[in-house]
Amino acid sequence: MKKISVFLVLCLSLGLFAACSKEEEKTYDYTAGDVYDAIKEAYGEDFLPDGDMNEEEYTVTYGLDMDKVEDIKAGITMISFHPDRLLVAKAKEGEGESVEETLEAARDNMVETGMWYPANLAKVNASQVVRAGDYVAFIMLGAVDEREDATEEEAAEFAKEQVQIGVDAFNALFEE
């Protein structure tokens, strides 16, 4: 009887482990606007984009193939001094990685060849592209570093912390 009980407990335990190890693909039903708004909310008054991007910007500036995009919401600052921008794309099923690669290339191009005010270089360099499944975000956001005596390293660290606010808000939507 004892051997049967031990055997049953072992079988039940193995069954539980097998059930836990099955990877379930979590699906989300956010619009690009939902994700955009969550990131915007995380920044509060430090969210500077106040104008919408248009399809020409999506395709020319960012190189997006709109046939791979199901939904998109993007904003940019209308004051040219600030580089702040947020682009959130919900790619068509299975196209998330492709959209991510395209936005990474656009980011790299902006970092390497963009004409930026020196005060904005840290923010531009700290920008990130993040992805969760078929949702992708290009994040170049954050408070303005008002310190006039900040070293290059301090400015870079401040900018990284500011961009991370958006990354964390994005990731929070997709945590299991």
Model feature map: region roles:
Residues 1-8:
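Positively charged n-region of N-terminal signal peptides that target proteins for export
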Residues 11-12:
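Repetitive helical segments and hydrophobic/amphipathic motifs
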Residues 15-19:
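C-terminal motif of bacterial Sec signal peptides marking the signal peptidase cleavage site
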Residues 21-85, 91-176:
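Soluble, non-membrane globular domain cores that form compact, hydrophobic packing
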